[in-house]
Each structure stands twice: as C-alpha cells, then as structure tokens.
C-alpha cells in the first residue's frame, strides 16, 4: 500500500509539472497593449496611414489627358486605353489602400489621448498629443479626398454618390456594410476633417527663436524649446496646416469640376476660388509665386533651391514633396 501511495504521489507530481510544460511561454509576440507602453508603436498606426498615400510614388494622374503620349509600352494609362481596364486590372483603384489607411487613422484617434508621448515632460507630452491628433485628422481627410476623386460617380439610382464615411474604427464585419454617402455629404466629411486638423497644426513647421514668433493657437506655450521639440525643423515634411489648406483647395476644385458639378453651380467655383485664394495670400500673393515654378523639374531650378544644403529651403512652387531622385526614367518614358 505504501508503494502505491508513493507511486501515486510521484505520478501526481509528474502530471502537474507536465501541465506547466504545456503552458505557452512568452514568445516575444507583440499584442495591441504594447502601444500603451511604447509610444513609437502607437505612432506606427499613424505612420501606416501615411504609407498608403498615393503620392508616395510617382503618379501622372493629373496629366493623363486623352492625347497623352508615352514611350513606355507598359504604361498603366496606355494599358487602360487599349482595353485592359477591368475589375481585375485597375491602376486607379484606391479603394482598398485608402479605406485601410482611414481605419488606421481612426484606430489612432481612438488611442491618441491615452498614450503618454513624453513621460518626463507633461507640457511636451500635450504638444505631441496635439500635433499627432491634427496629423491623423488631416491624413484621414486626404485619403477621403483621393477616394472621392477616383471612385465617386453616378449610382444606378441616378444620384451622385460619394464614399462610405468611416469616422471610427470598425470592430466587426457588419460595420463594413456602410452604404455610400452622397457626394455632397462626402465632401462635407472631408472639409470637417481638414477643419478639425487645422485646430491642432501650425501653418508650417520650423524652429523659432522667441516666444514672440509663436503661431496663432500656440501662444499658451511658455518655453521655446518645447515648441521646437514638437513643431520645429525635425517635423518638416509631416502634414502641416499649409498642406491641409492646399488639399482643401483641391477638394473645392474637384467638387466644382464638370465631373461632379453636374449643374455647373457657380457657388462651388466661388468656394474653390476662396479656398485657393487664402492659400495664395498665405504665400505672399503674386509676389510669393515662383516665376519659373512651371519649370521646377529643370536642373537650374533644382540647383538654385539647394535642396541638399541643409538650409531648409525648397522650391516655392512645391508645397509637399517626396525625396529627390537622380534617375531619368521620367524623361525616358515621356520625351
């Protein structure tokens, strides 16, 4: 009996220790909770939305007219014009990527107030929260704009339709059945995002030397270093107020264009003039325009801007650009 008892105890010890062996160990896989501990992971949601911007790569949508000519026999527009354009081949499909980016922006907006962006400085932490919130609204509005440009149109009911409006992160499959809003409702949604973004963003990024140089909306800041850390030179090329205003102007022009302004509503043209006029005033009016801006691609113009000199100058004609390349593929394909 004693042997049976000892055997039973040893067997029990083995069984219970084996249970521990079957328990999954920490395999270093990240969970969503990591965003609350490491702000760089939280910002990754926003950066992901940035990566889906159609302008991250060279596109020629704005110059693809009926008489466009190219030397590239595999050019997307040529393939579309010669019969390949279909549901299976659609180079103008922004539906998947832009909607995906909108959901990333929505998810980020849902957590941005819960993240500690700067543990050692509450004032700087609040400035980061402010800037990143503005960026998220701006990026969401930009993706809505591109969706409208490429996918809005007349529905089967004869109504001018826009896009499904997603202003929150979708938790389940049923939420994806949201119907398209009208074109007018969709445009209003874009403007709402841009207007909200402008509450948080300065017109331009860049270091300041004195509190007297603080832009409107930031006059409560008491330390120049705090402002420069968040809105200074290191933030250049991220979405700022000037870029938002430019997209508001583009949205207004799109809404006024014959493609979507089916009744030629003159008020829409006036609105487009107003939005773009404000941007020109911010640039200094006519004198702020580059007289050679239409030749921005020529070597003399690029050299004059000294883009690689580190002085933060740029071509006046260009508001927001991607990195500079030295290849000549564009010239080979189109000249």
Locate each region found by the language model.
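Membrane-proximal, proline-rich intrinsically disordered regions
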Residues: 19-65, 69, 269, 292-300
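Acidic, serine/threonine/proline-rich low-complexity intrinsically disordered regions
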Residues: 184, 246, 255-274
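Charged, glycine/proline-rich intrinsically disordered loops and linkers
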Residues: 206-232
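Elongated scaffold/linker segments in the mid-to-C-terminal portions of large proteins
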Residues: 37-41, 46, 50, 74, ...
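Conserved, well-structured interaction surfaces
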Residues: 44, 75-153, 171-188, 192-206
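Conserved alpha-helical segments that form or flank metal/cofactor-binding pockets of metalloenzymes
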Residues: 54-62, 142-157
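Bacterial Sec-dependent N-terminal signal peptides
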Residues: 1-30
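Short coil/turn linking the two alpha-helices of tandem helical-hairpin repeats
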Residues: 148-149, 155, 205, 254-263
């Amino acid at each position: 009996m004693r042997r049976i008892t000892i055997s039973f105890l040893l067997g029990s010890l083995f069984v219970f220790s084996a249970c521990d062996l079957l328990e999954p160990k920490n395999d270093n896989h990240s969970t969503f909770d990591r965003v609350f501990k490491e702000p760089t992971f939280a910002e990754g949601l926003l950066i992901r939305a940035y990566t889906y911007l159609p302008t991250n790569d060279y596109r020629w949508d704005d110059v693809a007219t009926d008489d466009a000519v190219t030397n590239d026999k595999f050019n997307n527009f040529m393939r579309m014009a010669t019969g390949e354009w279909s549901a299976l081949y659609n180079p103008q499909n922004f539906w998947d990527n832009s909607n995906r980016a909108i959901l990333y922006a929505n998810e980020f907006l849902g957590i941005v107030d819960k993240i500690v962006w700067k543990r050692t400085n509450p004032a700087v932490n609040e400035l980061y929260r402010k800037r990143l919130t503005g960026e998220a609204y701006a990026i969401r509005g930009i993706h809505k704009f591109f969706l409208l440009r490429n996918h809005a149109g007349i529905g089967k009911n004869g109504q001018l339709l826009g896009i499904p409006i997603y202003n929150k992160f979708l938790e389940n499959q049923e939420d994806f059945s949201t119907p398209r809003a009208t074109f007018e409702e969709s445009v209003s949604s874009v403007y709402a995002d841009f207007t909200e973004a402008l509450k948080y963003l300065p017109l331009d990024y860049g270091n300041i030397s004195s509190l007297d140089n603080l832009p409107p909306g930031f006059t409560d800041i008491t330390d120049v270093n705090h402002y420069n850390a968040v809105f200074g030179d290191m933030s250049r090329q991220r979405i700022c107020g000037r870029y938002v205003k430019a997209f508001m102007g583009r949205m207004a022009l799109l809404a006024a264009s014959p493609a979507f302004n089916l009744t030629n509503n003159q008020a829409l043209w006036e609105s487009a003039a107003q939005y773009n006029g404000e941007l020109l005033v911010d640039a200094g009016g006519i004198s702020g325009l580059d007289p050679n801006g239409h030749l921005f691609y020529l070597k003399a113009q690029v050299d004059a801007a000294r883009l690689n000199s580190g002085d933060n100058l740029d071509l006046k004609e260009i508001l927001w650009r991607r990195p500079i390349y030295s290849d000549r593929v564009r010239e080979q394909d189109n000249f």
